[in-house]
Amino acid sequence: MNLEKINKLIKAEYAFFLQQKKGWSLTAGPQDLELVAHALRVLLHARTTPDFLADYLALVDCQGKDGGWSPFSADRESTVWVSAFCGLMLIRGNRLLHHERLTRSVRKAIDYFLDAQQSDGRWVDPRWADLDTTSHPVSFFNVVMALDEPHRRHDVLQAWERGARFILDRQSADGGWYDNDFHPSGVEITAHLIQDALVADLVIDHCLSGVRESCAKGAVKLYEWQAADGSWDEENVDHTMDCTRSLMVVTRILGDERGEDIIVRGLHWIIANKNLQGWGDFPGMETNLERTCDGLDTLLKYKAYRSIDPRDVVKLWGYIP
């Protein structure tokens, strides 16, 4: 894959992303916070976070009293999945911004997730499968530990381990994870779990037994699920981006070179099926901002994946400072 072409695409799509700022920035008014978190991730990986402090502070402003966030910024009922995504963007963004309000917000979010965890280690959210929901606070806690955030460190470690073990114990024998109500195909949830929840342990502290084997089995299942044209899940743009990004970080950490061709095929398909500007949910569908953020994130991560230093792509998950 030609990196010059990738860089040109990144430049063009980032310009389009900025043109659409009113659609994702809290400084422009109330927003869908899942989209806001996607946008803040683009800023992180485009290395422009310091130019957008107001957006991070606006996210702090809509944090609930319980430490969580609601799916829509003007609402007040916190839910786990979006709260973890918001908290993750704040702790990663604050490495560059060094702002006391962000520090306090992250610590409130830690309290929220510690209070919300169920007795069996899972977290729940009515909008998401329990496994997918659980992977998000686990991912947040991965970064909390990687960045040496001291707030309630012992409690965080215990909650993280219980959440990760909940996920590990529910992997199917074929290497995938499934949920009949939310993820019957297993594609998206498997891609999420190995990159967001599990593989970080191999970088941070190797606390959990079975993680390497679990991630390797999950990656092989993603290889098997890829269609001949390079897509996943019946030409689902979102899930194809998820799988392509997941394999970038997982195969780098595992040292598995078999993923290279799979990743390149996925990226070729993603680029071939973009709109003039941005991406839709399926080929030929109208561009939407969330998918465009995912597309930009995929391109930016591929650029890091191609770096000589294998740690560069891992840094874009926050698992290495």
Q: What are these model-derived regions, one by one?
A:
Residues 1-13, 304-321:
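Intrinsic N-terminal pre-sequences and regulatory tails
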